[in-house]
Structures are given as structure tokens and as C-alpha cells.
């Protein structure tokens, strides 16, 4: 099959439905088909548009498929989704979307389905979703918000008035969040440099030092990225690192650090002095940290493979610790659309909560008296956030919740057990952080 962005997107979608890990399967397919430039961007746009809107796409397609989508061969199913996504969300003319879809049935050796694809798409592309009726609010969220049943039920239970807006929120306004390297430039100067180097748009973000930019392709293809003028990091993640308030000359540990964005910010706060231990449990992800640190020219970072659920004797007592723990990811549905369809199984949730709890206990042992611990997640699940902190404080009365070192954006307020960002309230990712101090003389 000749290199074709639509074919690449469909092939990646087939793999994603089988294996998950959306970014990995897409990257592998783009490399296999050797797509570059606009073709690569177009294939990526189709892929992520389908994932983001799959619930809506499937609902519409099923209006014209009496036996449903599940009975179709996987390539045919993804061809239908991809074509409808192009026509409905990507400003591709209906005729082009349909004709190319029919061609793809032949390319994937499914030519017997070409008539069905043609007929279903011509009806589906003109379907008026406003005429749809739903059994209940959860089904409405699943269709209009493109979510699986578990995620829809979670949002309906915990955020009933904001659920649909959370599902349809565009992360950072659809722009890419960056962090300027203060060793080379300021956020204001970076905006100017980005526009001069081909970015379509660049402006200051909500979090101090952050920049929001829109690129033609990947930010990693920009020369300023290769030269270490910025790294890609969500605004909420930047805020967590800022709240650590790392100081020059200190000993700091980033317990769950890969791919390294928060480590970079911590090292910059320390003016590349002191010692910063950047840890991850997977050796291949530690390699990502080392690559990021080298690109930014930071000299005070030691990246190491480490299980954060256990105390490693090789790690010293630290002045400050950041524990950005593994979580359900329910705050970043806009950035990782495959999470919309995840199963929220009680056994897995219990295992995740136990892991978070163990990491907090490790941090408690590694932190010096008077030191600061920042716990953060990219979820809006109270069990992983406020309830996790309440349980930690009950186990560790030597800790006290303190005011975050960085100013919180509008809409994000600190409570008894931490501060929560809900996308609809802050314009950032869904996110939680809690700054705590260990009893003893406060760090200066």
C-alpha cells in the first residue's frame, strides 16, 4: 500500500482499538509509512479526532447500521469513523471524505464493503445530532461528550453540572503549552522568537513563565526546541513544580519524573546548582529524562531508575520532594482521548490508590525535618486527591498542609487538603496539588 495519510490513520486506529497506547501506535504507523510534513500532520489529526469524538461518531453511524459497528471488520469500522470525523470535524468536503473512504476499502482488501461504506457515510454525514433523544443523562454524556460508560458515570456523579463541558473542553484552548528556559530566554522573548521561527501563534499562558503556542507540525521540529529554548509541559504540571519552590544549592527529589518536564523546571529554579535526583521506575523512561536534561544544558541532575513505592538507600535526605504520582488521568481527557473509554474497575482503582499511598510514605521518610513535599496528580477524582491526602495526614501527623508557594490561577482555590483545577473553572488541565511541610524548622 502506497504511503497515504488516511490509510496510516486507519491502520493506527485499528491497532489502538486492539492494543491501546494511542501515541505509541500512531508513532509506529507514521514511521512505517514514512509520512512527513503535512501528510504526517493530517494523519495525526484524523487519528486524534476519531478518538476525541468516537462516542458521537459511533452513535451517528449506528443510526444507519442495523447490526451495529461491532459486527464490521475492524478496518471497515475505522474507515467509517475516520471519514465521518473528517466531514464532521475537520472541514473536509463530504464528497472527498466519502470517495477516499471507498478507496480505502479496496486498499485494505475490504472492497466487498465499499457499497456499505458509501451508503452509510452519505447518510451519516448529513445527520442532525440535535434530533437525538437519550435514555438518561449518562447516555447523553457518552454520545455528546464521547466517553465510555464508566467515565460518563464518574463525571455525572462527581461533577453533574460540569460533566459535558469537561468532556468537550479543549486543553489550553487547543494550543501547546511550553515552558521557557530562563537560562536562555524569557516567556515574552520566547513568544517573539516562536513567531519568527514559524509558529502560527504564541502568547503568554496563565502560569508564570508558561507560553501557549500553535505549530504547523510537532513542537519538537522547531529549531528553538532543539536548541533548548523551551520544553513542552502542561501549565498545570508547571504549577506543581513551581509550588516545590526549589532553591539554589538544595537537595531535591523528583520521585516520578519521566519524561522530565518538571525536573527541568526544578533544575532551572535551582539555577543548575545543588543536587536534583530525577527518578522513574522504568529504565527506558529514565532515558527520556536524561535526553531532556542534556538538551536543556542542565548540570545538577542525576537521573536514576527507582521504585518510588520503596525507600532507596541510594537517595539522600532531601530538602524538597515532588511526588507527581501515577493516577487515573481523569483530568487530561482532552489531551489523552483514549482515557475517555477506560474501565474504572474497583480492583485497579484500589491498586492505584495503594501505589499513591506507598509513594507518599516513601516521600515522608526521605524528607528532612522542615522540608516541603508537593503531591500532585492529573486527575479530578477525590479518592486520589483530597481523600488520599487526608489519609496520609492521619498516618503522618508530623506533616501539615501549607499554602502553595506559587499563586494559584483564577478558579483554582486551596482547600483543607489541597487545591483542585477543574478544566471548566481554570482553563487548564484537570489537576490537583497539595503542598505539605514536615515538622521542624521551616526551610528558608
Where are these regions (language model features)?
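S-adenosylmethionine
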Residues: 1-444
Amino acid at each position: 500500500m502506497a504511503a497515504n495519510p488516511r490509510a496510516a490513520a486507519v491502520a493506527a486506529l485499528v491497532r489502538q482499538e486492539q492494543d491501546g497506547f494511542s501515541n505509541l501506535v500512531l508513532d509506529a504507523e507514521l514511521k512505517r509509512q514514512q509520512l512527513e510534513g503535512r501528510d504526517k500532520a493530517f494523519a495525526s489529526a484524523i487519528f486524534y479526532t476519531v478518538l476525541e469524538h468516537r462516542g458521537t461518531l459511533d452513535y451517528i453511524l449506528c443510526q444507519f447500521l442495523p447490526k451495529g459497528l461491532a459486527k464490521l471488520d475492524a478496518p471497515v469500522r475505522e474507515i467509517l469513523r475516520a471519514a465521518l470525523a473528517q466531514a464532521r470535524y475537520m472541514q473536509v468536503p463530504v464528497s472527498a471524505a466519502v470517495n477516499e473512504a471507498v478507496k480505502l476499502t479496496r486498499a485494505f482488501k475490504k472492497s466487498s464493503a465499499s457499497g456499505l461504506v458509501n451508503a452509510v457515510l452519505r447518510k451519516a454525514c448529513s445527520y442532525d445530532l440535535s434530533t437525538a433523544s437519550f435514555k438518561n443523562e449518562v447516555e447523553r454524556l457518552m454520545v455528546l461528550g464521547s466517553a465510555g460508560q464508566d467515565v460518563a458515570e464518574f463525571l455525572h456523579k462527581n461533577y453533574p453540572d460540569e460533566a459535558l463541558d469537561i468532556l468537550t473542553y479543549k486543553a489550553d484552548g487547543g494550543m501547546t503549552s511550553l515552558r521557557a528556559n530562563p537560562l536562555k530566554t524569557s516567556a515574552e522573548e520566547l513568544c517573539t522568537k516562536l513567531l519568527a521561527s514559524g509558529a502560527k501563534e504564541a502568547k503568554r499562558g496563565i502560569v508564570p513563565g508558561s507560553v501557549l503556542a500553535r505549530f504547523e507540525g510537532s513542537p519538537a521540529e522547531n529549531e528553538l526546541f532543539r536548541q533548548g529554548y523551551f520544553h513542552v509541559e502542561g501549565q498545570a504540571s508547571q504549577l506543581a513544580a513551581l509550588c516545590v519552590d526549589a532553591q539554589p544549592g538544595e537537595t531535591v527529589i523528583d520521585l516520578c519524573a519521566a519524561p522530565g518536564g518538571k525536573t527541568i523546571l526544578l533544575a532551572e529554579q535551582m539555577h543548575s546548582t545543588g543536587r536534583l535526583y530525577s527518578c522513574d521506575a522504568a529504565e527506558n523512561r529514565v532515558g527520556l529524562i536524561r535526553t531532556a536534561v542534556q538538551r536543556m544544558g542542565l548540570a545538577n541532575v542525576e537521573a536514576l531508575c527507582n521504585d518510588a513505592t520503596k525507600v532507596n538507600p541510594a537517595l539522600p535526605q532531601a530538602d524538597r520532594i515532588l511526588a507527581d504520582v501515577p493516577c487515573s488521568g481523569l483530568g487530561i481527557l482532552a489531551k489523552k482521548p483514549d482515557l475517555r473509554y477506560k474501565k474504572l474497575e474497583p480492583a485497579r482503582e484500589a491498586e492505584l490508590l495503594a501505589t499513591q499511598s506507598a509513594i507518599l510514605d516513601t516521600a515522608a521518610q526521605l524528607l528532612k525535618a522542615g522540608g516541603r513535599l508537593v503531591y500532585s496528580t492529573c486527575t479530578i477524582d477525590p479518592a486520589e486527591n483530597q481523600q488520599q491526602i487526608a489519609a496520609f495526614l492521619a498516618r503522618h501527623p508530623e506533616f501539615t498542609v501549607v499554602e502553595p508557594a506559587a499563586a494559584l490561577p483564577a478558579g483554582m482555590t486551596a482547600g483543607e487538603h489541597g487545591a483542585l483545577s477543574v478544566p471548566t473553572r481554570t482553563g487548564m488541565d484537570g489537576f490537583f496539588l497539595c503542598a505539605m511541610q514536615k515538622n521542624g524548622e521551616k526551610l528558608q
